[in-house]
């Protein structure tokens, strides 16, 4: 996907570098960061995701912080959730029993590269079709005006 993003960025570079786009992007990102830090339950999902990533990477030890810790002193519920998150991932998902949890990543990257190639071909086809229809429309317009 990163290759497709690079191709897309080069294609639409002028639009991406406009002042209006940059200002709206900065405002949106700031707004999202503020809202994310205000909602403690998003932190619960974030902690679970981080613990999963650490387990897949083969971490020797995982410590999950209570989800409400950045906002207020942690409650007994948030401490219990933090304590049990890594245990649930290890016992119910059997992440500890897997020898190489990220072993199939090469195949996903291969499929991603195939998708990029197909998307780029579709973009090229759409651009050529658009140019072709523009030529036809222009010809019809000229014929209708008697040129």
Curated annotation (Swiss-Prot):
Matching SUPFAM superfamilies: Cobalamin (vitamin B12)-dependent enzymes (SSF51703)
GO molecular function: cobalamin binding; methylmalonyl-CoA mutase activity
Cellular component aspect of the GO annotation: cytoplasm
Record-linked Pfam families: MM_CoA_mutase
Family: To methylmalonyl-CoA mutase.
GO biological process, one term: propionate metabolic process, methylmalonyl pathway
InterPro entries documented for this protein: Cbl-dep_enz_cat (IPR016176), MeMalonylCoA_mutase_a/b_cat (IPR006099)
Organism: Alkalihalophilus pseudofirmus (strain ATCC BAA-2126 / JCM 17055 / OF4) (Bacillus pseudofirmus)
Protein name: Methylmalonyl-CoA mutase homolog
């Amino acid at each position: 996907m990163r290759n497709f993003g690079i191709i897309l960025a080069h294609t639409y570079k002028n639009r991406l570098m406009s002042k209006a786009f940059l200002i709206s992007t900065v405002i949106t990102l700031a707004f999202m960061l503020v809202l994310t830090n205000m909602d403690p339950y998003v932190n619960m999902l974030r902690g679970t995701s981080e613990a999963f990533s650490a387990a897949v990477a083969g971490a020797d030890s995982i410590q999950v912080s209570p989800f409400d810790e950045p906002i207020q002193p942690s409650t007994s519920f948030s401490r219990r959730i933090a304590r049990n998150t890594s245990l649930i991932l290890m016992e119910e998902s059997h992440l500890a029993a897997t020898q190489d949890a990220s072993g199939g990543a090469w195949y996903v990257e291969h499929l991603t590269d195939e998708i990029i190639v197909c998307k780029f071909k579709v973009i090229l086809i759409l651009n050529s079709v658009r140019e072709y229809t523009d030529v036809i429309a222009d010809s019809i317009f000229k014929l209708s005006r008697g040129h």
